[in-house]
Amino acid sequence: MINHFDLKKVPPSIKEDFSEILKIINQCFSSHFKVKNNLFYELSFVSEKQSLQLNSSLRNKEYVADIISVCLWENAEIITPLLGEIFICSKKIAKDAIKYDVNFWYLLIRMIIHGLLHLLEFDHEQSDAYEYVTLTIQEQIVNKVIKTAKKKIWKNQELLSLLG
């Protein structure tokens, strides 16, 4: 089972619902890949400034990223139960949700799954074929998460609108 082991700086406005959504993401992701061992990742919310700094230092890219994954398995001699760390810029995701006219929660779920795929070394930037496979798997898991989450009762009205 894939589990987050540490959450840092979750914005208070989404904290309660976010914990539930994250459990569903972990369950659906683990189920999709038939993960039997305990694997872990760290998830941290960062500011736009921190996202820019991380993207610059880790990826040599000069823009605010919605999500940055740091895979500990990449080129590793030893595989550990710790997959890596995911940095989320919720302000960037909120801006993108408005820009692309999609729900914030949908985009947040999609980006976390995208980040988890990167931790498993799925790299959509490698080729068109890798991009197709990665994004297909991503959408399959997103759909499972939404379907599972629809069965839950949420207090957050925005989240209720996402789940229909």
UniProtKB/Swiss-Prot annotation:
Subcellular location: Cytoplasm
Any Gene Ontology CC annotation: cytoplasm
Enzyme class: hydrolase
Gene Ontology biological process terms from the UniProt entry: rRNA processing
Highest taxon of source: Bacteria
Alphabetized UniProt keyword annotations: Cytoplasm, Endonuclease, Hydrolase, Metal-binding, Nuclease, Ribosome biogenesis, rRNA processing, Zinc
Predominant cellular place of this UniProt entry's protein: cytoplasm
Documented EC number(s): 3.1.-.-
Binding site residues for Zn(2+): 114, 118, 124
Cofactor binding note of this UniProt entry: Binds 1 zinc ion.
Claim: 4Fe-4S is one of the keywords in the record: no
Function: Single strand-specific metallo-endoribonuclease involved in late-stage 70S ribosome quality control and in maturation of the 3' terminus of the 16S rRNA.
Protein family: Belongs to the endoribonuclease YbeY family.
Protein name, per record: Endoribonuclease YbeY
Species of origin: Mycoplasmoides gallisepticum (strain R(low / passage 15 / clone 2))
